[in-house]
């Protein structure tokens, strides 16, 4: 097995070289995810597999709507996710499109699944959401997408062990390069 680090936008891939190509948490950050999927699919040998995984934030919600932090968490997420989508920074709802990207890339034997995880405030997983929000906060603030108090409230919720939430769906989609040809 050879594991490689690769920049899908600038580094060439050898056509038909790999039995398996996998990417995770990448495509939602790209302006043209289909082109990236096609590039990766072209690197898979006939009979090999492409597996792509990314988030869909449709499920992001407080697990207990009666928790004192739930309403602010929900309201702020409801403002930020459409803002990030409209700004082109990332596509927070890309996960639901992964199966169609695999099909559009010409792969066969396609499949998909989605898993939502329950996160507890103060956990490492909740910290990941907090840090991601922290990195994106300056842009949200400068464009008026959210106030500092709202961002602070979400940050406090993700650090509060009494608060829990459903995180983004982790969507996986896969397909096989046909043995009689290549992916598109």
Residue ranges and their predicted role:
Residues 1-10:
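Conserved SAM-binding strand-loop segment of SAM-dependent methyltransferases
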Residues 9-21:
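A short acidic, Gly/Pro-enriched loop at the edge of an enzyme's catalytic core
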């Amino acid at each position: 097995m050879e594991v490689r680090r690769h920049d899908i936008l600038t580094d060439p891939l050898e056509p038909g070289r790999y039995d398996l190509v996998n990417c995770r948490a990448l495509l939602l950050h790209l302006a043209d995810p289909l082109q990236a999927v096609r590039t990766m699919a072209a690197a898979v040998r006939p009979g090999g597999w492409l597996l792509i995984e990314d988030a869909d934030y449709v499920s992001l919600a407080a697990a207990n709507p009666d928790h004192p932090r739930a309403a602010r968490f929900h309201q702020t997420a409801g403002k930020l996710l459409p803002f990030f989508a409209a700004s082109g920074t990332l596509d927070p709802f890309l996960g639901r499109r992964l199966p169609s990207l695999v099909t559009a890339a010409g792969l066969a034997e396609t499949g998909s699944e989605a898993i939502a995880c329950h996160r507890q405030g103060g956990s490492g997983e909740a910290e990941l959401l907090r840090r991601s929000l922290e990195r994106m906060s300056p842009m949200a603030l400068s464009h008026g997408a959210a106030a500092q108090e709202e961002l602070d409230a979400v940050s406090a919720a993700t650090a509060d062990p009494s608060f829990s939430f459903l995180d983004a769906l982790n969507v996986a989609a896969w397909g096989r390069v046909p043995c009689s040809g290549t992916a598109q």
